[in-house]
Amino acid sequence: MINILVSNDDGVQAEGIRCLTEALSAFATVLTVAPDRNCSGASNSLTLTNPLRINNLDNGFVAVNGTPSDCVHLAIRELCEQEPDIVVSGINAGANMGDDTLYSGTVAAAMEGRFLGLPAIAVSLAGKELLHYQTAAYFSAKIVQGLLAHPLAKDQILNVNVPDLPIEAIKGIKVTRLGARHKAEGMVKTQDPAGREIFWLGPVGKEQDAGEGTDFDAISQGYVSITPLTVDLTAYNQLAGLEHWIKIL
């Protein structure tokens, strides 16, 4: 039997993780371990100064008082009876495209699985109303089965974004590169009830690089976007130039 570890960053009670677990359970044994609260934007953060605690829920899910990366690390090292065949993170409530991937706890949970030597994918539902989690769950299951039958290189994860459309309205699947956004808009300054100044992060930047071949473009056309992401962040095409640069310092 196939063993799958599922996690997310929206929290253990999120609709997306419930739909994902249900879809994958049709052909695999699934362990779902996720944060006990919403951890959107947690990126690859780990909890280093406090202990992690687990709470076994009535539906079989495991809630952890930690980050998405904590959840995957803890599950693989301590909670899984057998090592998972694959880690699946999602289904995120909202897209993770372009620059979003650097901040995403959804992507980070998948990356943590890859750090520990396992195939991994991150899945997000791209849209505003977020009505069609079942569509994302359907394509998640399809992609997972494909990965298990035909594994990819070990230094990558797949970042999957699914349009918020009925299954029959999806035009297909496109392999894409990450697009990019303009810089984020300014902070929102306001006051708390006591009159003290507080700040909220402003809206994300508008799409800057959203042309043909990008994840933004695929989603806008009604296609599922699959972007391979590498764990190695080295800019190899800059190494020679940097070698020259340090000689003239």
Swiss-Prot record:
Keywords per UniProt: Cytoplasm, Hydrolase, Metal-binding, Nucleotide-binding
Reaction(s) this enzyme catalyzes, per UniProt: a ribonucleoside 5'-phosphate + H2O = a ribonucleoside + phosphate
Cofactor(s) annotated in UniProt: a divalent metal cation
EC number: 3.1.3.5
GO cellular component: cytoplasm
Keyword Cytoplasm: yes
GO MF, any single term: exopolyphosphatase activity
InterPro entries named among the record's database cross-references: SurE, SurE-like_Pase/nucleotidase, SurE-like_sf
Cysteine-cysteine disulfides: none
Co-factor: note: Binds 1 divalent metal cation per subunit.
Residues noted as binding a divalent metal cation in the record, renumbered to the chain: 9-10, 40, 92
Pfam families assigned: SurE
Chief place of localization: cytoplasm
Keyword Iron: no
Compartmental location: Cytoplasm
Function statement: Nucleotidase that shows phosphatase activity on nucleoside 5'-monophosphates.
Family: Belongs to the SurE nucleotidase family.
Name the UniProt record assigns to this protein: 5'-nucleotidase SurE
Organism expressing this protein natively: Shewanella denitrificans (strain OS217 / ATCC BAA-1090 / DSM 15013)
Organism phylogeny: Bacteria, Pseudomonadati, Pseudomonadota, Gammaproteobacteria, Alteromonadales
